[in-house]
Amino acid sequence: MTLRNPHLGIDNDELMRRVEALINASKNRYRITVQVANRAKRRRYDDPNDVEEGWMKPIRRAIIEMSDELTEPEIIGDE
């Protein structure tokens, strides 16, 4: 049984499924790990006063965003 904290957005099981999907979709595990870390780092330093989503750690946010881009390519597609 996984306890879900309403401030985390998704539970740990869902987060792990998203991580596995990212790794499986990538040809290189190291590269996808570095990409996620770089996105989290960039997001953290781009807007350090982000109060709206300040309760979510940057690494969790980066995983969620990148997995959404993987499963829903129209998010990043050109219109």
UniProtKB/Swiss-Prot annotation:
<dbReference type="GO" id="GO:0003899">
    <property type="term" value="F:DNA-directed RNA polymerase activity"/>
</dbReference>
<dbReference type="Pfam" id="PF01192">
    <property type="entry name" value="RNA_pol_Rpb6"/>
</dbReference>
<dbReference type="InterPro" id="IPR003716">
    <property type="entry name" value="DNA-dir_RNA_pol_omega"/>
</dbReference>
<dbReference type="GO" id="GO:0006351">
    <property type="term" value="P:DNA-templated transcription"/>
</dbReference>
<dbReference type="GO" id="GO:0003677">
    <property type="term" value="F:DNA binding"/>
</dbReference>
<keyword id="KW-0804">Transcription</keyword>
<keyword id="KW-0548">Nucleotidyltransferase</keyword>
<comment type="function">
    <text>Promotes RNA polymerase assembly. Latches the N- and C-terminal regions of the beta' subunit thereby facilitating its interaction with the beta and alpha subunits.</text>
</comment>
<comment type="similarity">
    <text>Belongs to the RNA polymerase subunit omega family.</text>
</comment>
<comment type="subunit">
    <text>In cyanobacteria the RNAP catalytic core is composed of 2 alpha, 1 beta, 1 beta', 1 gamma and 1 omega subunit. When a sigma factor is associated with the core the holoenzyme is formed, which can initiate transcription.</text>
</comment>
<dbReference type="GO" id="GO:0000428">
    <property type="term" value="C:DNA-directed RNA polymerase complex"/>
</dbReference>
<protein>
    <recommendedName>
        <fullName>DNA-directed RNA polymerase subunit omega</fullName>
        <ecNumber>2.7.7.6</ecNumber>
    </recommendedName>
</protein>
<keyword id="KW-0240">DNA-directed RNA polymerase</keyword>
<dbReference type="InterPro" id="IPR006110">
    <property type="entry name" value="Pol_omega/Rpo6/RPB6"/>
</dbReference>
<dbReference type="InterPro" id="IPR036161">
    <property type="entry name" value="RPB6/omega-like_sf"/>
</dbReference>
<keyword id="KW-0808">Transferase</keyword>
